[in-house]
């Protein structure tokens, strides 16, 4: 965006010839806008006029004053308004730039990104992007209606408004005062002279006057940082508001849960009073519920609940209600089981009686004669006796093996005891031998010292004798 503002500054510092051309173009533009404002109703069809009246005017530039508003994000506002203006221009198809068709493509990305080819071969000026070069395109009625529907829309600058684009006060953007811009009262014909057309076509100046150039306002890093901090503050405020909302919702939930608990307690008291006889578990549950209600009453008298107290009370109440429901459902379950038993007893009573009668009449039935039955019985008896003998033999062998194992264990215990005694005795003998060995080593050391002393004495004696011999000879 800073490139666009700087380009507009470069445009204002051009040669005198370009400034004179801009003055002539300003005269032509002012006359054209006056002429178009007067005849826009006759040029625009009724259907198009109604749609244009209902369509809000595109906004191009924000209101920039000498003292900037710190809460206004200028960059985002300029990007949004430029995109809106480009989309509005795209609705009116493409314009003819110097006889060559040149379609206008809407820019969906912000202007702060990489520069498109549109910025490479044209002056980087906001109006050079949004308006065509050739003002002679608006000589026809259709072009006049298009210019009347777009360029005469209210913006931040003092344009003459046509009667076909009357909008409500709420949808109009703020308009600067007309004192800083000269009012054009030129009554030239609609088509400018030929030399003006050539100058405008050959020059790189746009078809708008200097009044159309936005007010220059550089955006420095301090303002960007301030806008960033303000955005963060707004985010924190939103989070704080959300936290307050959650707190209020939780407080309402606590109140609702407390009311539900009190209602459940009242229902339990009504059930207790309406029931003639209750079980001991139900009585204990009701007593606990009454105690819990008393605790709640004391807590209410003491002050508000804390979150831990609320969780504790809810847990206790849920446990009490669960125990009470378990007792009630257990009683109902037992009653159902007894009813099922009685029902099945009645259902199968005839079958049971019939089976009992059959069992009673079975001994009176005639015996079935079988010629091989006696032989099979004798064979089975013989097999039984054989198996009995084998079993007794196996039992005896097992007993013998058990006795052998017991004797072996006893012998092993005795052997272990003797081995331990021998080991302890050998340990004592080894200790004695070790002591004797130490004594012998000590004696040996003493003898070695004595022998060393004797050897030393003998050597001294030999030396003394040699000296005596030498003295005698001398």
UniProtKB/Swiss-Prot annotation:
List UniProt keywords, sorted A-Z: Centromere, Chromosome, Coiled coil, Cytoplasm, Cytoskeleton, Kinetochore, Microtubule, Nucleus, Phosphoprotein
Domain of life per record? Eukaryota
Compositionally skewed regions (Basic and acidic residues) per UniProt: 25-36
Keyword Cytoplasm listed: yes
Q: Where are the transmembrane segments?
A: none
Record keyword Flavoprotein present = no
Coiled coil ranges: 219-273, 367-471
Q: What subcellular locations does the record give?
A: Nucleus; Cytoplasm; Cytoplasm, Cytoskeleton, Spindle; Chromosome, Centromere, Kinetochore
Task: Give the span(s) annotated as Disordered.
Answer: 1-79, 93-114, 164-223
Q: Where is the composition biased (Polar residues)?
A: 66-76, 177-189, 201-223
* GO terms assigned for molecular function: microtubule binding
| GO aspect biological process, one term | astral microtubule organization
State the oligomer form and interacting partners. Interacts with alp14.
Q: What is the recorded name of this protein?
A: Microtubule protein alp7
Its source organism is Schizosaccharomyces pombe (strain 972 / ATCC 24843)
Q: Which gene encodes it?
A: alp7
């Amino acid at each position: 965006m800073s490139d666009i503002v700087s380009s507009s500054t470069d445009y204002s510092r051009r040669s005198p010839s370009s400034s004179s051309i801009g003055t002539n173009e300003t005269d032509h533009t002012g006359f054209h806008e006056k002429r178009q404002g007067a005849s826009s109703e006759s040029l625009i069809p009724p259907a198009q006029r109604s749609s244009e009246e209902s369509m809000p005017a595109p906004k191009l530039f924000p209101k920039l004053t000498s003292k900037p508003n710190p809460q206004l994000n200028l960059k985002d506002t300029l990007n949004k308004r430029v995109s809106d203006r480009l989309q509005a221009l795209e609705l009116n198809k493409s314009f003819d730039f110097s006889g060559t068709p040149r379609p206008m493509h809407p820019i969906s990305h912000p202007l702060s990104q990489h520069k498109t080819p549109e910025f490479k071969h044209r002056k980087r000026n906001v109006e050079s992007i949004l308006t065509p070069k050739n003002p002679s395109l608006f000589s026809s009625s259709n072009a006049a209606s298009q210019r009347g529907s777009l360029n005469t829309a209210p913006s931040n600058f003092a344009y003459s408004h046509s009667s076909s684009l009357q909008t409500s006060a709420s949808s109009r953007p703020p308009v600067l005062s007309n004192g800083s811009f000269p009012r054009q009262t030129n009554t030239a014909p609609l088509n400018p002279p030929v030399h003006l057309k050539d100058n405008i076509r050959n020059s790189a100046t746009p078809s708008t006057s200097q009044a159309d150039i936005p007010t220059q306002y550089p955006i420095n890093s301090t303002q960007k940082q301030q806008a960033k901090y303000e955005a963060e503050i707004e985010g924190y405020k939103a989070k704080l508001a959300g936290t307050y909302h959650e707190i209020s919702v939780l407080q309402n939930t606590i109140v609702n849960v407390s009311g539900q608990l009190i209602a459940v307690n009242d229902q339990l008291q009504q059930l207790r009073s309406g029931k003639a006889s209750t079980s001991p578990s139900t009585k204990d549950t009701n007593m606990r519920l009454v105690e819990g209600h008393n605790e709640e009453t004391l807590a209410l008298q003491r002050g508000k609940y804390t979150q831990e107290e609320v969780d504790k009370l809810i847990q206790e109440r849920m446990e009490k209600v669960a125990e009470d429901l378990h007792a009630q459902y257990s009683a109902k379950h037992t009653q159902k089981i007894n009813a099922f038993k009685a029902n099945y007893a009645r259902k199968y009573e005839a079958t049971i009686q019939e089976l009992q009668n059959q069992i009673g009449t079975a001994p009176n039935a005639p015996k079935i004669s079988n010629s091989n039955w006696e032989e099979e019985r004798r064979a089975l008896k013989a097999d039984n006796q054989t198996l009995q003998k084998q079993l007794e033999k196996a039992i005896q062998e097992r007993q013998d093996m058990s006795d052998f194992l017991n004797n072996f264990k006893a012998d092993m215990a005795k052997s272990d005891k003797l081995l331990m005694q021998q080991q302890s005795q050998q340990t004592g003998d080894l200790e004695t031998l070790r002591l004797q060995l130490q004594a012998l080593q000590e004696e040996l050391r003493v003898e070695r010292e004595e022998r060393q002393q004797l050897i030393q004495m003998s050597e001294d004696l030999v030396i003394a004798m040699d000296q005596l011999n030498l003295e005698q000879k001398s």
